[in-house]
Curated annotation (Swiss-Prot):
PANTHER family: CHAPERONE PROTEIN DNAJ (PTHR43096:SF48), DNAJ HOMOLOG 1, MITOCHONDRIAL-RELATED (PTHR43096). The J domain is necessary and sufficient to stimulate DnaK ATPase activity. Zinc center 1 plays an important role in the autonomous, DnaK-independent chaperone activity of DnaJ. Zinc center 2 is essential for interaction with DnaK and for DnaJ activity. The keyword ATP-binding does not apply. CXXCXGXG motif repeats lie at residues 146-153, 163-170, 185-192, 199-206. Its main location: cytoplasm. A zinc finger (CR-type) spans 133-211. It comes from the Bacteria. It comes from Acidithiobacillus ferrooxidans (strain ATCC 23270 / DSM 14882 / CIP 104768 / NCIMB 8455). This is Chaperone protein DnaJ. Residues 5-70 form the J domain. Keywords: Chaperone, Cytoplasm, DNA replication, Metal-binding, Repeat, Stress response, Zinc, Zinc-finger. Participates actively in the response to hyperosmotic and heat shock by preventing the aggregation of stress-denatured proteins and by disaggregating proteins, also in an autonomous, DnaK-independent fashion. Unfolded proteins bind initially to DnaJ; upon interaction with the DnaJ-bound protein, DnaK hydrolyzes its bound ATP, resulting in the formation of a stable complex. GrpE releases ADP from DnaK; ATP binding to DnaK triggers the release of the substrate protein, thus completing the reaction cycle.
Length: 375
C-alpha cells in the first residue's frame, strides 16, 4: 500500500508551524490511541501512521528533506514511535549517498564510517510521571566495545598490518568520467588496517552484543511526542569508532481523570444538583492531592472553575499551567418513594417563583425563532 502524504496524515497544511503540528498530533494520537480502541486493528494502524508522520514533520531537518524529496528523503530514518529499537541515520545525506552508490557501486560515508548506529527507545509514562518527572531504568539491547580486544578486533598480542589496498590511509580515490570521489577502502572498511588474527570473542568486529541497564532522568513536563537525546548511548562504534546516540521517544498514557492540553489539565467533576442549587464546598482532584472549591448557590451545569498553577510545569518555561474543572450535574437514579414525594412537592411549590435562567433564555430564543418562521 502506498504511503500517504504526511501532511495529509496529520490533517495540516504544508505551511503549518511547530505548534500546529504538535497540536494536531496530540488530537489525532488521543483519538486513535490503541488503549482507547481495543481490538480495533485499523485504529492501531492509523496511530502508527500518525506517529511516523509526526516523527518526520516535528524534526526540522527531516521535514526539509521530506518537503524536497518526499518519502525518499526520509526512508532511512528507522521506525516511528511504535518501532521500539531501530537504527538511526537517514535524512538529507542519504539522498545524495544513494546517487554515489549507483555511480560507483558502493557506499559513501566519509571518514566517520566507524560510528555506531543511533538507537530509538519508546518510553511509556503515566501522566503523573510525565508531569512530575522521574528517574527510570531501561534495558538497552545494543552492541558494546569488546573487552578482550578493546575494540580493535584483533586477537591480543597479534600483529595488525597496514592495508595493502589503501596503503593504511583508509580511503581510496575512484574516478569515473569527470567525477573523482574519495570513499572508504572496501578492503579494510576505512580502518586502514588489516587484522591477521581476529579476536575470538568478537570475531574481528571489535563489538559484542549485550543488554545493559541505563538510568534515565526524565524531566518534569514532558509530553507525548517529546524526544530525549542521550549522546554516546547508542551502538558502539566499529573498531574503536565513536558510539551512536540514543533517542528516547516519550508516550504518555491516557489518564482516568485528566485530559492534557499543553501545560493545562481538564477534569469533569460530577456534582449533586442540591449542591449546585444551594451552594457548598466541593473537593476536586489535582496531580498533587485534593483541593477545595466553593460552589455559589445557583451554579449551572457546565460551569468551569480554574485552579491556577495546578496544571503541569512546562518543561521549557518552568511555569505551571492551570487545572480547569467542569462541573456536571449528576441526576439521581433509583429514587425511593419518599424522595419522589419530596421532588414532587418541590415541583408544586416552585411554579413561577423559582428562576431558571438558562431555561428562560432558551425559551426566549425559541420564541424568537418561531416568530421569525411564522409558526
Amino acid at each position: 500500500m502506498a504511503t500517504r502524504d504526511y501532511y495529509e496524515v496529520l490533517e495540516i497544511s504544508r505551511t503549518a508551524d511547530d505548534g500546529e503540528i504538535k497540536k494536531s498530533y496530540r488530537r489525532l494520537a488521543m483519538r486513535y490511541h490503541p488503549d482507547r480502541n481495543p481490538d480495533d486493528a485499523s485504529a492501531e494502524e492509523r496511530f502508527k501512521e500518525i506517529s511516523a508522520a509526526y516523527e518526520v514533520l516535528s524534526d526540522p531537518q527531516k521535514r526539509q528533506a521530506y518537503d524536497r524529496f518526499g518519502h525518499a528523503g526520509v526512508n532511512g530514518g528507522g521506525g516511528g514511535p511504535g518501532a521500539g529499537f531501530g537504527g538511526g541515520g537517514g535524512g538529507f545525506g542519504d539522498v545524495f549517498s544513494d546517487l554515489f552508490e549507483q555511480a560507483f557501486g558502493g557506499g559513501f560515508r566519509g571518514q566517520d564510517s566507524g560510528r555506531g548506529a543511533d538507537l530509538r527507545y519508546e518510553l511509556e509514562l503515566t501522566l503523573e510521571e510525565a508531569a512530575l518527572g522521574k528517574e527510570v531504568t531501561i534495558q538497552i539491547p545494543s552492541s558494546a566495545t569488546c573487552e578482550v580486544c578493546r575494540g580493535s578486533g584483533a586477537k591480543p598480542g597479534s600483529a595488525v598490518e597496514d592495508c595493502a589496498t589503501c596503503g593504511g590511509r583508509g580511503q581510496v580515490r575512484m574516478v569515473q568520467g569527470f567525477f573523482s570521489v574519495t570513499r572508504p577502502c572496501p578492503q579494510c572498511n576505512g580502518s586502514g588496517k588489516v587484522i591477521k588474527e581476529p579476536c575470538t570473542n568478537c570475531h574481528g568486529h571489535g563489538r559484542v552484543r549485550r543488554n545493559r541497564d541505563l538510568q534515565v532522568k526524565v524531566p518534569a513536563g514532558v509530553d507525548t511526542g517529546d524526544r530525549i537525546r542521550l549522546n554516546g548511548e547508542g551502538e558502539a562504534g566499529e573498531r574503536g569508532g565513536p558510539a551512536g546516540d540514543l533517542y528516547i521517544q516519550v508516550r504518555v498514557l491516557p489518564h482516568a481523570l485528566f485530559e492534557r492540553d499543553g501545560d493545562d489539565l481538564h477534569c469533569a467533576v460530577p456534582v449533586q444538583f442540591t449542591t449546585m442549587a444551594m451552594g457548598g464546598e466541593l473537593e476536586v482532584p489535582t496531580l498533587t492531592g485534593r483541593a477545595k472549591v466553593q460552589i455559589a448557590p445557583g451554579t449551572q451545569s457546565g460551569a468551569v472553575f480554574r485552579l491556577r498553577g495546578k496544571g503541569i510545569k512546562g518543561v521549557r518555561s518552568k511555569l505551571n499551567g492551570d487545572l480547569h474543572c467542569q462541573l456536571q450535574v449528576e441526576v439521581p437514579v433509583h429514587l425511593s418513594a419518599r424522595q419522589k414525594e419530596l421532588l414532587e412537592e418541590f415541583a408544586r411549590e416552585g411554579g413561577d417563583n423559582i428562576q431558571h435562567p438558562q431555561q428562560e433564555s432558551w425559551w426566549n430564543k425559541a420564541k424568537d425563532f418561531f416568530d421569525r418562521m411564522g409558526l
